């Protein structure tokens, strides 16, 4: 009974604060300037024409809640349990301080409806044609023949294919016999796997695959001839772990991309067992290790793909701390899903190759700006798009 009382109290307090908060001082802005200003508070501002009118309208209630305006009949906390509501309120993902007046909110919606297209009709396939991969031949392999199998990981390491399913199974596949064998079993799905040079194995267990504010993820290490050991628990939907000796002290640091949902982070578990927060926002998909500024210290580069979509570098300082810097930022509709950092043009500088195409959100439609991009480094850490394939 106490749990239910607390649940309804939290809902009441949230709705009270978001609807009865202090109103912002009104500033007279043109509709275009108002859109550009308010839609750039949390991320790169999109343009109105990136979505059709009906999808903007569908997104208004959520957008309003983010700005502190609660539209009639909309509860952004619907479907969450008590712990999730606690986490969202504490994070202030939905601001308690209204950042637009009711009049400005109406002005924003009218501007979007007047200027958004009825449909996005400029979707065209790229004209660039690629040569056939004549050096390769496809070979079908049998991984998901069992009813209800959902593959959550494919990892090819040391001539062995490892894969995992939604139900916590972790398997190896033998190419010669075309047979799979169960390697380990976990409570929930494994979504990332890494073998270290010393033979240790790192397993990233997501917890709950569907969007949630519950922190159910875990990080495991399997050392040779030892029982599997839990490194960390209560992780927020972790999807990737980079396990490397970043400061060259002989010990491994684990950099964890906690994608999360409304909240999330990039965290790092150091060799002494402490956990450091590198990035306080959701959407981290993966982290790589590079010497970005060529100072001899290994830095981190991460892809963040939720809200404030960006590629962020974490420059290692001499004291071992990491300083975040944006390398690239994208509007929140770009659907960033992967990146690689390579010297693509052979000039000695690391360039960026990004894939944009995640479309599983409230604004599902074919989007002409989804595709593969190559952004070249000018040598000073500035990146400019040089190639786009749709």
Regions inferred by a protein language model and the residue ranges of each:
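Bacterial Sec-dependent N-terminal signal peptides
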Residues: 1-30
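Beta-propeller-forming repeat regions
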Residues: 21-29, 37-390
């Amino acid at each position: 009974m106490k749990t239910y009382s607390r649940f309804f109290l939290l809902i009441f307090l949230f709705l009270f604060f978001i609807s009865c908060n202090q109103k912002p001082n009104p500033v007279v802005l043109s509709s275009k300037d108002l859109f550009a200003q308010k839609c750039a508070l949390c991320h790169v501002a999109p343009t109105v024409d990136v979505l059709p009118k009906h999808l903007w309208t569908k997104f208004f209630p959520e957008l309003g809640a983010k700005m502190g305006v609660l539209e009639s009949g909309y509860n952004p906390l619907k479907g969450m349990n008590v712990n999730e509501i606690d986490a969202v309120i504490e994070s202030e993902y939905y601001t308690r301080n209204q950042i637009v007046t009711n009049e400005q909110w109406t002005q924003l919606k009218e501007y979007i409806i007047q200027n958004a297209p009825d449909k996005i009709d400029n979707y065209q396939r790229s004209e660039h044609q690629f040569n056939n991969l004549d050096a390769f031949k496809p070979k079908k392999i049998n991984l998901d023949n069992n009813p209800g199998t959902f593959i959550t990981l494919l990892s090819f390491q040391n001539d062995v294919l490892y894969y995992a399913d939604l139900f916590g199974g972790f398997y190896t596949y033998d190419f010669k016999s075309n047979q799979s064998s169960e390697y380990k079993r976990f409570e929930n799905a494994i979504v990332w796997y890494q073998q270290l040079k010393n033979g240790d194995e790192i397993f990233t267990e997501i917890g709950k695959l569907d969007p949630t504010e519950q922190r159910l993820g875990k990080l495991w290490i399997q050392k040779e001839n030892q029982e599997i050991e839990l490194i960390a628990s209560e992780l927020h939907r972790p999807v990737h772990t980079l396990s490397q000796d970043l400061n060259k002290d002989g010990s491994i640091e684990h950099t964890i991309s906690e994608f999360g949902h409304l909240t999330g982070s990039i965290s790092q578990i150091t060799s002494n067992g402490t956990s450091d927060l590198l990035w306080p926002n959701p959407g981290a998909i993966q982290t790589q290790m590079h010497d970005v500024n060529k100072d001899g210290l290994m830095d981190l580069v991460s892809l963040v793909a939720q809200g404030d979509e960006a590629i962020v570098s974490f420059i290692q300082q001499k004291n071992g701390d990491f300083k975040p810097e944006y390398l690239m930022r994208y509007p929140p509709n770009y659907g960033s899903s992967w990146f690689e950092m390579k010297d693509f043009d052979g000039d000695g500088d690391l360039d960026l190759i990004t894939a944009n195409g995640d479309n599983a959100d409230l604004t599902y439609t074919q989007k002409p700006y989804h595709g593969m991009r190559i952004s070249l480094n000018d040598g000073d850490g500035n990146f400019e798009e040089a190639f786009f394939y749709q």
